[in-house]
UniProtKB/Swiss-Prot annotation:
It catalyses: holo-[ACP] + H2O = apo-[ACP] + (R)-4'-phosphopantetheine + H(+). One of its GO terms (molecular function) is [acyl-carrier-protein] phosphodiesterase activity. It is an enzyme of class 3 (hydrolase). Belongs to the AcpH family. Pfam families: ACP_PD (PF04336). The keyword Ubl conjugation does not apply. This is Acyl carrier protein phosphodiesterase. Its EC number is 3.1.4.14. The keyword Cell membrane does not apply. It comes from the Bacteria.
């Protein structure tokens, strides 16, 4: 899961959106650094990551990637799941538009930015004004996201090439998304994540 799915599941679980978005920017035990609700959100994000990476449907998707890209497949898949969530948002969340959800998330997160790490503040300088969460629905934007990640982290250079595997196996990946994401939504609503 990437930013959109983590925020969506957090919202369904009534968990801290700030904590769920912040989690990748916090190392170690966050207790004592943030308030308990934010810590609980960070921990939920970590549980969702472990759960998602170990789902049989997600593990099976690694086979859709060429040998040279398989090492980065879990990262690519996290971004791809956000694409399918954004693309099918109205079907999954008919009562709230994606722009409306994005606005709600932004309003809950931005007031707390001064208390967060500089790298997280930097992310927030792009994610909201450039409408990343909404643009995840656009497949070319996913290619740009992967290329950007590859250029910022040389050891992840294979991310740029992994987009070809996504395009080649798009429908199979979409089918797998539908096999697990609605169930994760229900788990979030039931506070089981």
């Amino acid at each position: 899961m990437n930013y959109l799915a983590h925020l969506h599941l957090a919202s369904l679980a009534e968990s801290s959106l700030l904590g769920n978005l912040l989690a990748d920017f916090v190392r170690g035990n966050p207790a004592g650094e943030y308030n308990p609700a934010v810590v609980a959100g960070i921990m939920m994000h970590r549980r969702v990551d472990v759960l998602t990476d170990n789902l049989p449907q997600v593990r099976a998707c690694r086979a859709y990637f060429s040998e040279e890209h398989r090492r980065v497949a879990p990262i690519t898949l996290d971004v791809v799941w956000d694409h399918f969530l954004a693309r099918h948002w109205q079907q999954l969340e008919p009562s709230l538009s994606l722009p409306g959800f994005t606005q709600q998330a932004q309003s809950q997160i931005l007031p707390h930015l001064p208390l967060t790490p500089p790298r997280f503040q930097n992310l927030n300088g792009y994610i909201w004004p450039e409408r990343w969460l909404e643009r995840y629905a656009e497949l070319p934007f996913i290619g740009n996201v992967l290329a950007g990640m590859a250029s910022r982290r040389p050891r992840l250079a294979a991310l740029a090439g992994s987009f070809a595997d996504v395009e080649r196996n798009y429908h199979q990946l979409e089918t797998q998304f539908w096999q697990f994401y609605p169930q994760m939504m229900q788990q979030a609503k039931d506070k089981q994540l």
